[in-house]
Design a protein with these regions (language model features):
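Short, polybasic Lys/Arg-rich linear motifs in disordered N-terminal/cytosolic regions
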Residues: 1-340
Length: 340
């Protein structure tokens, strides 16, 4: 994190939250400054140590460090969540399509979709059964995310119990609900000369054969399909790289979480993802820069039950998924964005 970004966060927190302002106690002794409190929270997140890490460095008690971390994460979400965890607009999708078509050869690709488990050491005993899965070493909570080629996280959904698989998480995620409710932004494109009304996500083999999902061939029968399988698996690693960078930047996510509630875990996870996107923007790696907070986006009307049923039917229409996969697997993967 750059010094400029750190000072920006400190100034915004001091301006909007009384907790981060320096105040005197009953004896007139001044307490910690906003810079000290933000440094405390960032040290815990970056190094992944326990909350007594600042005993000697900042002369800050363990409870103060823990409270500061909670206020810091909540402040980051409230101040920056609307910008750095926003849903892409139509204009954003045009830029995303262009970048992914140039970098990966996939026109219409919105991003890569996958899940990550975070160990929960202090999971209540009564909940351990539903948070434990055989391939994990203990209770976990699942994060589902969508990442771009530059590792920007467009969508994050955290809080599903660890016993679920990727299909269960996907089926209950707001990402799928937005498509069914017709709230998801859509931009059409062409694949192999065929018109496609909306984009898609690259996923691994466990995900269902939905129209917004592109998987690879399990057993390619010719060189073109084998090449497609290689490129698809390589491009899908964007989300794996993103998870690796998140854990490397914020070691707190690599270690088992010691929070007592999932809400505190959720605040930490979303705060780390938001700061991850802020760092990418500060380094000039962001694809979309057209966020205008003054413009109030028009609320989407509620879809009727009939519309929801039709959208769900179109979403689960396997022939569309198969046709799109064949288009990519039988020709050179070059397409153009269709401005509709």
């Amino acid at each position: 994190m750059s010094k400029r970004l750190f000072l920006r966060i400190v100034d915004d927190l001091e301006t909007n939250y009384d907790y981060f302002k320096q105040k005197a106690d009953a004896k007139g002794t001044l307490g910690f400054t906003g810079i000290q409190k933000c440094t405390s929270a960032l040290r815990v997140l970056a190094y992944g140590n326990t909350t007594d890490i600042n005993d000697e460095y900042l002369k800050m008690a363990e409870k103060t460090t823990r409270d500061t971390l909670e206020h810091f994460c909540r402040g980051i979400i409230d101040l920056y969540g609307a910008r750095y965890l926003r849903t892409p607009t139509w204009d954003d999708l045009q830029k995303i399509y262009e970048v992914h078509s140039a970098e990966h050869g996939f026109p219409g690709m919105i991003g890569s979709l996958d899940c990550m488990h975070w160990r929960w050491d202090n999971c209540p005993t009564a909940w351990r059964g539903q948070h434990t899965r055989g391939d994990q070493k203990g209770p976990t909570v699942i994060l589902q995310a969508v990442a771009l080629q530059n590792l920007w996280v467009w969508s994050a959904y955290f809080g599903v119990v660890g016993s679920c698989n990727d299909i269960n998480v996907f089926e209950q995620s707001p990402l799928l609900e937005d498509w069914i409710s017709d709230r998801a932004p859509k931009a059409s494109f062409y694949a192999n000369g065929n018109y496609c009304p909306h984009g898609y996500y690259l996923c691994d083999g466990i995900y269902p054969r939905y129209s917004i999902v592109v998987k690879t061939f399990s057993d390619p029968i010719d060189e073109k399909r084998a090449h497609f399988k290689k490129v698809q698996q390589s491009s899908r690693k964007d989300i794996e790289r993103c998870f690796g960078v998140l854990k490397q930047q914020w070691q707190y996510l690599r270690n088992p979480c010691r929070a007592w509630t999932k809400q505190k875990m959720r605040d930490v996870m979303y705060a780390c993802i938001i700061m991850h996107n802020m760092i990418l923007e500060g380094e000039g790696k962001a694809i979309c820069h057209n966020y205008v907070p003054e413009v109030v986006q028009e609320e989407h009307p509620h879809a009727s039950m009939e519309e929801r049923v039709n959208n769900a039917r179109e979403l689960r229409y396997e022939p569309y998924h198969s046709a799109l996969t064949v288009d990519f697997g039988t020709t050179r993967m070059v397409g153009s964005v269709c401005p509709t």
